[in-house]
Amino acid sequence: MFKSPSSGNRSLQLEALPPLDVSSSLLCELSLECLAHYFTWVPLSNTITPNLLSTIFHFAAFGCEVRSSYHHHHLHHRSGGGGVLITGGGGVNTTGATGGGSGVPGSPATGGERVGGGGNNNNNSSRGRSGGGGIGGSATSTSANAASATGGAIANTPVSASTTAAAAGAAATCPSNGGGGAGIVAPANTQSLGVLAMNCINELLSKNCVPQEFEDFLLQMFQQTFFLLQRLTKESTLNTSGNKLADLDECYVEKFTDFLRLFVSIHLRRFESNAKFPVLEFLALLFKYTFRQPTNDGFYSCLDIWTVFLDYLHSKSEMRTADHEEVTNRYKPALQSLVSHILQKLQFRYNQSQLEELDDESLDDDSETEWQHYLRQCLEVIAKVGEILSQETFQLLNDLFQEYTEVYLGLEQYVVPNGAHGRKLTITAENECRRLHCILRDLSSLEQALGRMAEHFIGDRFIKNFTDADNLVQRLVHCVAYSGSAKLYEVSSIAQTVLQPDFIEVHAQALATLKAFAHWLSQYHSESQKISQPLKFTILFSTLVEATLPLFRKQIPEKIVQSAAHLLLSLMVTVRPSYLLQMTAVHNLYSQIGHGHCKDMPQEVQLLLYRALSHYLLLPWPHLSDTDQDWEKRAAYHRDFTRQLTLEFCQLRDTQALVENKALQESAKCLIENTLKMCQDWIENIASESNKSKQICYQSLHEIVQVTLAIFPVYIHQPDTADHILSFFLAVFQGLRVQMGVNFTEGIIQTFMGLFTREQLTENILHENSAGCRVVEKFLRILELIVQEPGSAFKAFLPSIISVCMDQIYPVVAQRPSPDIKAMLYKLLFEFFLNNWRYYFKGSLLSTLNNQNSEMMENSAQFIAIMQAFGQSFLQPDIALFRQNLESLETLNTKWKLYHKKVFREALLYQFLNVFIQVLLQKSHDLLQEEIAISVYNMASVDFDNFYTQFLPNFLNGCDGLAADQRTVLGQNFKMDKDMPSFTQSVNRFVNDLRYYRLINSSLPAGSFKF
């Protein structure tokens, strides 16, 4: 069965595979399974012969046959190498062998590609055969003109003689039960053979290291692949769609897709310039294979293959700039056709029946609906093509966008008054409403696609592509202004439930697309300032702002408001021209927001609005000198704006009322949370800006900080509210510590130290929910910032900080199995050592130069206690904490020579060595085996002689489960090497031998002789 045809009979077809009995089928399956396992561990070599490869492809071709509808049994795949167990008898014997494989796409013998499915029309006549349409002559059932407009770039590529010869040669190795006939039905047991054969081929293909003499062998493999691809993409007469892939075993199609992915990602670069491998014909077949995938997952996998290919082309053109135009021109028709067909596949206009089946409500783990995932996958490939053919890709998108916006902007003529019911849409025909629905959905998709192209219009391409970008942004601004004035989502129609979400989506997506062009607007602003011609930009930007600001009302759909808030933030932060405060609409928005007009909106929208309006006043205006920034006026404006927003919060300063009135205390929680979230958001987003911006921000928030500090004692026993308060203070310490000043910072720290008593800390740590632990962690994070502070300003707090850590927190968390707080506690202790080493070691430079004892140490008992706390963490199962503390010790040794210190050598060194070797013996932290061995080396290298003569014998004497002679052998076999590689190797051998002796001894009966 595995004998390959002789070279002299290559032109002859093999006879049809006879029905296999169970034993013959199992023999073939096990043989292929063994080959797959064999290929996983052998390199490409002469043992893998062309005859063997041809035989494997012989079996791979069986998977191309349509499954029998009479005797197709379920195949149970083995978990190992993909083996298959067939239940039942043999398959149906096939008759009427048809010869030869089909030609490559574009040849007269090839059936036309069918893309989409087009609405509800399933007329078989739409599957017309053509010799030169799109890639494969594509024409959709709903619009043949639209499909043919995309052109036949790849399909019309002439087929080289070598390709035809290769296909014919490959065909000879495949059985006649399907040499191209679409009506052949495969025996059930041959399906599994095809899957197993593809496993073997994929194992070969997954090898990245290919000897040069083996490349011809791989070339033969890929030439044989042409035949299989032609078979797979051939028209079928067994289903109404004419798609053969829909009738094949899903596992086989998946394996073949894996094959294509491996080829493109690993081997295409080897053969892309090889005259014997026609890349364009291969892409034509890959194209047909992509758009005939019967499942969305299969389609996504094929898009991933195209993404890999496009990345390869992009990197190739970038590395060889001289050949950029040649590479681009070679693949331009193919890539344009790819974009055109992806656009068809994602448009409801052509593909409504399939796209309507995609769920657009339930979110997956990536917070995407099924439709959003489908659209994103398509747009990512289009964007990849845009990196290579930016102008051509943009033109394809923009032409459709212009067409759809013409319809959208003309809808107002169909809107008429409807008495007390507002307005109504006069389009009443069902097919016209369906057409409008498709146009609106497609317009939203195109807006999103154009947003992905925004990066191609900025930087050094700004001037070159300015006209296209300007026209597009003008059009988008017009759409936003029109959407805001027309309010089409308020219009009633016979398809209200369908069209209303469509109108909302178009408006929201137009705003989101303009957000993507914020950097282009910023560069436009900059360029207009350079040439002293800002008028055109000012008109455009003002129109956009005036169309966006009225959208912040509760009557506006939430989706539109959210997009508008994101856009406004980008405009205020990225562009921020200086004249905005002079606009009446902007001035009114500050007033409305300050008086609480957006409090009914979602909190995310509120935070975006507050940040946009705050940052416009805090950040320096671009292209203006510091003297022209008008900081004084802006600071006053920001203080007034902040005061309006926080007026109610500042009234909580009277803490006596909060203490006495529990109802007021409870009702104030929401106000405290919202106010502190807003202020925290401001601080976190201003933290990396200039000192001037942070100074104005702190001046506005100074009263908020004081009030928050005053109410903290009231809520110290309520972890949820205390968590928000500590989050705010942590942001203040991280972003505005310099602006607060030393005195005020000291006051805050003293307040915290007084509040966080041992009882309070214990209460928070043991609280039933995680909020209490979060409070303690944030308190420790604030203390960490204090110990990291250079200079002597906060040195007075160091004893108190150590006391809090070791006397109040560590005793509570040390024996708890939960990792909560521990990581932050050890991080604080590490930072304490790293930044305040002289707190323990007072040695001076002079004493070091005079060879005097420079280890004048203070608080040695405390130092040892902290180090023992680190050692305790190495006895616990938490591997993340183990890694963190191991790295901490190594860092301290690198910077401060920790292991060399006398106190460490005398009191701690043996303890740590013992713990680390015990951990290696127990294999409890095997993921860190190498790191632990290196730490053992660094500790032993302090005094190798002491390690070999003192520690090692003592360690062996203390080991249970060993005989005396075994201890002697272990000690003698530990080589006294002093270089790290040899030492760590000795440690690992020592640990393995010791573990082996213990295992052997424990398995012997009592009284047995021990080796």
What are these regions (language model features)?
Residues 1-71, 78-85, 107, 114, ...:
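Karyopherin-beta/Importin-beta family HEAT-repeat alpha-solenoid scaffold
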Residues 70-77, 119-125, 166-169:
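Low-complexity, intrinsically disordered transcriptional activation domains enriched in glutamine
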Residues 92, 98-102, 107, 114-127, ...:
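Intrinsically disordered, low-complexity repeat regions enriched in Pro/Gln/Gly/Tyr
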Residues 94-95, 168:
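N-terminal amphipathic/basic-hydrophobic helices that include classical n-h-c signal peptides
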